[in-house]
Structures are given as C-alpha cells and as structure tokens.
C-alpha cells in the first residue's frame, strides 16, 4: 500500500498513522509532510523504526529549501517515481 503524508508531522497524529502501516508499505512524504524527513528529527526516527520504504518528493523539498537538511536514510524521488509508486500500489491512503 502507498501512504502519502501531506501534512506536517507536527499537525497530524503520526503515532496513529504508524500503527496502520504494514511491513513493506511505501510511504511518500510530500507537501508539508517532507518536514518528517529532516535529519535527526523525532518524526524521522519514528518512521525509520517502521518496516516501510520511505520516500520524499524532491520538488517539495526544493520548494521549502530543505533538500540539504534531509536524512540520507530517506529516498528522494521525483514526480516520475511518484507515478511509479502509485502504479505499483493500487491501494493508497492519503494523510
């Protein structure tokens, strides 16, 4: 399943979202959700403990000036990769 997190991790119930993730799920951070991938942040550490694949949309990082502050443990992807994730995951949940 593809989970897209579009809100800041400080404006949503990230712990509830984490409980709904299953092993092997893809999680894409976009819009203000990219804040969750800041290197050393508590939201990032929580996401990395989950058995998921973590992706961050490059264009949204650039729009917020955060590209250099993102953890190397998160995979930065573009819109083409976003489409591939959507095709690979027929079931999707937007947060």
Swiss-Prot record:
Mind telling me which Gene3D superfamilies this protein's record contains?
DsrEFH-like
Q: Which UniProt keywords apply?
A: Cytoplasm, tRNA processing
Per UniProt, subcellular location reads as:
Cytoplasm
Which terms in the GO cellular component ontology are assigned? sulfurtransferase complex
Q: What is its main location?
A: cytoplasm
Name of one Pfam family that matches: DsrH
GO BP terms: tRNA wobble position uridine thiolation
Protein origin, superkingdom: Bacteria
InterPro entries, A to Z: DsrEFH-like, Sulphur_relay_TusB, Sulphur_relay_TusB/DsrH
What quaternary arrangement does the UniProt entry report? Heterohexamer, formed by a dimer of trimers. The hexameric TusBCD complex contains 2 copies each of TusB, TusC and TusD. The TusBCD complex interacts with TusE.
The record, for PANTHER family, names: PROTEIN TUSB
Family statement drawn from the similarity comment of this UniProt entry: Belongs to the DsrH/TusB family.
This molecule's function is given as: Part of a sulfur-relay system required for 2-thiolation of 5-methylaminomethyl-2-thiouridine (mnm(5)s(2)U) at tRNA wobble positions.
This chain belongs to the protein called Protein TusB
**Species of provenance:** Erwinia tasmaniensis (strain DSM 17950 / CFBP 7177 / CIP 109463 / NCPPB 4357 / Et1/99)
